[in-house]
Amino acid sequence: MKYLPNLVVASLATLLLASCGNGDSTVSMEVRLTYNDAPYAVGETVYKGDTAVKFEKFYFYLSDLQIGDQLVEEVMFCNAEDSTTMNYEWSLENKANSFFFCVGVDSLNNAMDPTSFDVGHPLSSANDMYWSWATKYRFLRIDGRSNPSGTLGTDDILLAWHTGKDELYRCVDLTSQLAGAIKGGDHLILEFELDQFIQNMSLETESMTHAMADDYDIAVKLSNQLPGAFNLRVE
């Protein structure tokens, strides 16, 4: 019986350690389109100066998303009209002080055959983001229209920004936007700020690119806008 107190103490210590180790390690993230700091829904009309703009399709790839030293997602297909592709959850191994990702598909995955993936895979041909064996995946697929008169109508300027090719892969480091460590239980909001993305684009003369020779400079300009078009908030 003289060993009973020690046994009780040991049992309590074990329970205490177990309870301390059962904290929530889940981190969730929403990818959100915004325009002038307000959430943007595909099909909504917004304004760049006096020009009316409407995005009607908005698809893009994010790759190599790292929170701290942990690679949480190799590739993500984001369809702004499908919330299941804009919301994610991961189990975070440790607190993290950095956040990094790239826009597009890295060169290894860009060389893959899309028909080799299951329908639910981000790189599946079902997502209709693959051009051909020569040009490979589209990194961005943005379709819409604009009108400098301020009213959309029959004389709209069509917008088609389709970029791809390995050299247009762009990476984004948002570590400097973190006020503190990312930890289990946090909800991250990754904002794609469309007003920042299009601010240096001419909606009249730079409205079309398929990353081909005759419009490649527009694809490069769009791609170079990407690192400054994302914002990270932690809730």
For the regions a protein language model found, what residue spans apply to each?
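A short, solvent-exposed, low-complexity linear motif enriched for acidic/polar residues
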Residues: G21-E235
